Amino acid sequence: MKITSFFAALLLLDLFSCCHAYPQDTLPDIEDAKFIEDCVRAHNKFRSKVNPPASNMYRMSWDAALAKTAKAWAKKCIFKHNVYLKVPRKVHPTFTPVGENIWTGTATIFSVDAALSDWFNEVSSYDFNTRSCSHVCGHYTQVVWAESYKVGCAVQFCNTIENMPGFFKAAHFVCNYGPAGNYPTKPYKAGQPCSGCSNEKCIDKLCDWDTRPQPPLYVPPAEHPHPFCDQYCLTISILRPLFLVLSVGATFVVQQQFPHIFFYE
């Protein structure tokens, strides 16, 4: 006699929980060379396309400390800005405050270029002459903020996003900027490209400040190793022991009632 359906269902559910608690993450890490190149290239591409042209737009380069801060915050899977951006030396040893842009979308459609395009396209709501914004413009103005010359980004797979109910299996993309932009002034000075540069080289209409001292290597406090488990993970952690207890209990009951029954593959 075989009694397998009930136990097979429990086993499959347990295996499903185990295997899908942390889906295979194909999104790049902050040390991925192509990801770094894509982030820097996309930012500089859009910074060189501003209209009217910018006379003082710096060419961005990667900052590992900003990327670590972005990663630490992205891992929380919360759709809101980092609460420590204005706290001195909390998220970066040099820049205070730190700028931040966030993009969240379905993981299967994520790309750095798509996210940057969405931010840059906010230019349609921004009037450069009056600094007025008819809708959302803050992501655009931070991307093209002339004096922001360092960027660090991270993307995190999130089963769910806090503050975005009903949104599942998302790519949560965060970019941090130093120094921060979005002050109550224009994001850049209009004029002949690079005419506002000092001794910097002019590359693709951007002032290349490669001689500027590099910020020190830094691991933000939020990135120190600590256990991490989102809401989906917590649910699975609770359900798996429950299924195990049910399986053991059911096995014991069946063995008591039918001592000669056995299971086989």
Where are each of the predicted segments found?
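Mature extracellular or exoplasmic CAP/SCP-family domains and secreted bioactive peptides
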Residues: 2-265
